[in-house]
Amino acid sequence: MAEKRNIFLVGPMGAGKSTIGRQIARQLHLEFYDSDSEIERRTGAEISWVFELEGEEGFRAREEKVIEELTENMGIVLATGGGSVMSKESRNRLSARGVVVYLKTPIEKQLARTQRDKRRPLIAEAEDPRKVLEELAQERDPLYEEIADITVQTDEQSAKFVVNDIIEQLESINGLG
């Protein structure tokens, strides 16, 4: 790669941001970060515990700080948390400091991928996870679209196909690869 440019993955929970991000980083020889994992590393606690103790507002403040710091690096792939786009500052940083890839995933796939994951505080205790995901999509989808340079559907394709599709699009818009 002539120019090391950051790649930021956004999208709802269960879109495959971490899985896809790791594979992109591996193929392009970039460093991979996951904002949720970074928060867990820094706090020494699971996201659900941070949510329980500090509420969503406290968690979002931590997330914003992590995104601010990580986006200052060059040559990284960052999988962001699904709600990271709720912060205007984070949206601005992501847009200004790299290529934003929106992994678009239907509610059905999100449900299938997240139904047994107790580490997702917004749906773990929900009576109706589908309704929660639909409400989150209504609120967040326009924000993902607002900052996306590339949008890729992740519902029916394999991770390998999605990764190759993203890399091809990155090469065409940026000369990456």
From Swiss-Prot:
Compartments reported by the entry: Cytoplasm
SUPFAM superfamilies, alphabetized: P-loop containing nucleoside triphosphate hydrolases
Pathway: Metabolic intermediate biosynthesis; chorismate biosynthesis; chorismate from D-erythrose 4-phosphate and phosphoenolpyruvate: step 5/7
Stored PROSITE patterns: SHIKIMATE_KINASE (PS01128)
Main location class: cytoplasm
Lineage: Bacteria, Pseudomonadati, Pseudomonadota, Gammaproteobacteria, Alteromonadales
Enzyme superclass (EC): transferase
Source species: Idiomarina loihiensis (strain ATCC BAA-735 / DSM 15497 / L2-TR)
Cellular compartments per GO CC: cytosol
Chain sites annotated for binding Mg(2+): 18
EC number of the protein: 2.7.1.71
Names of the cofactor(s): Mg(2+)
This protein's name: Shikimate kinase
Gene: aroK
Binding site for substrate: 36, 60, 82, 140
Keyword Transport: no
